């Protein structure tokens, strides 16, 4: 039982790692599009963010998994489930991260940009050395909340047949007629979440050199 749950946890861990690797950088251009003065770009970003945040992640997984077959007639392969799952998680979380970035960037007073210009800073230097340190500190709690939510959201992958830890525990409960696999899975999720919270707390302390 523990071996099977361990294998399921590794799948959940892979999804947990791959999602931020894709969604954190993807959220950056979406955030800048959202703040763009070019109306079409701004509206594309607004619609994207609205769809990602306004529809269930599970529904997005189903759409990405089945769309190639029903729309283009592309045959589904054993790898299709995993690919659809990762893509759905990345584009979903990118929508949330984009809004977090936007709120962080727009929270910086305009006067700081003007002061940097007077001091001879270029736009890039202003962004890297003045704006980014403040934005990073301000958005970290919100980013942390999304990362913690992601730990639990990995269990949604079972909906399209990805063998992560929850689906493994569910199969074990059915075969063994026992709730023990669920209890062990819950404990693993809790420990994993606790470790993530500790790491995020350490990161917040690391950025505590700047005080509003």
PLM regions: where:
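Transmembrane alpha-helices and adjacent helix-loop boundaries
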Residues: 1-212
């Amino acid at each position: 039982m523990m071996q099977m749950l361990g294998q399921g946890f590794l799948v959940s861990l892979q999804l947990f790692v791959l999602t931020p690797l894709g969604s954190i950088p993807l959220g950056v251009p979406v955030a800048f599009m959202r703040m763009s003065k070019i109306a079409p770009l701004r509206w594309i970003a607004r619609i994207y963010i609205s769809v990602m945040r306004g529809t269930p992640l599970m529904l997005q997984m189903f759409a990405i998994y089945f769309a190639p077959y029903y729309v283009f007639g592309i045959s589904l392969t054993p790898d299709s489930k995993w690919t659809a799952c990762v893509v759905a998680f990345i584009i979903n979380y990118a929508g949330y991260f984009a809004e977090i970035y936007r709120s962080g960037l727009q929270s910086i007073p305009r006067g700081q940009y003007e002061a940097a210009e007077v001091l001879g800073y270029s736009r890039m230097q202003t962004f890297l050395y003045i704006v980014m340190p403040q934005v990073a500190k301000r958005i970290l709690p919100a980013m942390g909340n999304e990362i913690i939510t992601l730990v639990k959201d990995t269990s949604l992958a079972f909906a399209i047949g990805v063998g992560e830890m929850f689906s493994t525990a569910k199969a074990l409960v059915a075969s063994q007629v026992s709730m023990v696999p669920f209890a062990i899975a819950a404990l693993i999720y809790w420990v994993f979440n606790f470790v993530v919270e500790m790491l995020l707390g350490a990161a917040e302390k690391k950025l505590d050199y700047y005080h509003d």
